[in-house]
């Protein structure tokens, strides 16, 4: 389907009188069932209120480089419409992959404490624990690299199904493990599934979400990650004293994976991917469900804008297209800045050390002297869950940038306090900690970790997963694949080095190191991270064309809030 900008501009320049607006719709080059019903050359009559939304909404769009005569200028009309509750149900259904992600990262913490001699007849060493945790990260790294290409080739829904199947297989391998390397293979396999899911689900949600709630929809995915971690710690606690209970811990990951496979039947495909695959009728139907009160013209306008955004700029063989896609990502300034932002945020998230706490919190609290380290770890997971809900409520109010810059300082302060507390914990002549949970410094360690996790969950735990919004459709699969690979590479490094760092440079040095890395990340965000709140995916590319757009994004956010305040005042006066 091909529609010229000239045809579109004829619509925007049409006049209107009294209560109606006459608009010539677009004539399609190809005749399809969709085009004959949506873009057939007919005259439509739109109510004045629809026209008002089209013109006023377009003129109020804050990007000063976009005029009413351009297609992008009309995008705001449908985005201003009420969103169907179906979108929220869809987000929770798709986000079950996040629950799997969280369950897998959380459950291993308790399992490592109780595996005992089940793997080969001898106790796990620190090296064995690091191998088990890092195998998942290595599998996820490789899965994340290929997930983007799989998503572009097969579609978003089939790849979610592939991830669920791989997780089920990995769970079975772990349950049947009787040797260390058998367990490592199972962790590696499940890592593939988790890595694929960690890319495809935020990508899917960002493509289907209206711009005004895109941040919150992606946070639902992160919220379900944290819910999975809470469930994992609860399962760990329940099976801690059961013979071979760790097999139940790792095996129960099959349940949500199987459930997600089942509900995929009712999930729609991404409208942007449907348009790219020339399945425009399905895309129209999906958008109509997302915006149930929107006028058909507004949905057609949205479809036109999506079509312009997903138009394949590359020609040639598949290999030539792959090469051109790499060049477009790395040599197009806008796309390369998007890649820097996405990879930088993912690296910042992992190098903050959070996942070392998820993987080894039970081990840490056992070292500190808590009598029930797994139950204590549940407090950490619950904190993560609660403050992810807080982030859900405030991300689109405060904006992404302010939220990130403020919460990272909470992480830094908590890590410094934790480092100091470890320094003052009593030790024996061999350097082993001898305090119990009644020791004041042990309590300080716990409180500082709670503050650290609360700060992380409110900002850095969520924002990197908004990465899909940074990339245009032409490089989205590759760009999100690269940034997700950075996430899992950092995760691999953290998981493989944490216990070694605790031994070699002491817990004080380890947590101080994480605090220093957080500060470096904060500096990078201060100078390079724009606030993308209320930008459509198509507009973000324009913002990044000539720089990182930090100042322009802040002006944009200020204008949007001012416009919303005026809109509320107008409604109050009209009432």
UniProtKB/Swiss-Prot annotation:
PANTHER family: PROTON MYO-INOSITOL COTRANSPORTER. The keyword Glycoprotein applies. Its main location: Golgi. It holds the Pfam family Sugar_tr. This is Myo-inositol transporter 1. It is a multi-pass membrane protein. It catalyses: myo-inositol(out) + H(+)(out) = myo-inositol(in) + H(+)(in). The chain crosses the membrane at residues 87-107, 130-150, 157-177, 187-207, 216-236, 247-267, 350-370, 377-397, 401-421, 442-462, 487-507, 511-531. GO terms for molecular function: myo-inositol:proton symporter activity. Transporter for myo-inositol. One of its GO terms (cellular component) is Golgi apparatus. Residues 1-86, 151-156, 208-215, 268-349, 398-400, 463-486, 532-575 are cytoplasmic. PROSITE patterns: MFS, SUGAR_TRANSPORT_1. GO terms for biological process: myo-inositol import across plasma membrane. Keywords: Glycoprotein, Golgi apparatus, Membrane, Transmembrane, Transmembrane helix, Transport, Vacuole. InterPro entries: MFS_dom (IPR020846), MFS_sugar_transport-like (IPR005828), MFS_trans_sf (IPR036259), Myo-inositol_Transporter (IPR050814), Sugar/inositol_transpt (IPR003663), Sugar_transporter_CS (IPR005829). Coiled coil: none annotated. Residues 108-129, 178-186, 237-246, 371-376, 422-441, 508-510 are lumenal. The keyword Magnesium does not apply. It is found in: Golgi apparatus membrane; Vacuole membrane. Belongs to the major facilitator superfamily. Sugar transporter (TC 2.A.1.1) family. Glycans are attached at residue 432. It comes from the Eukaryota. It comes from Schizosaccharomyces pombe (strain 972 / ATCC 24843) (Fission yeast).
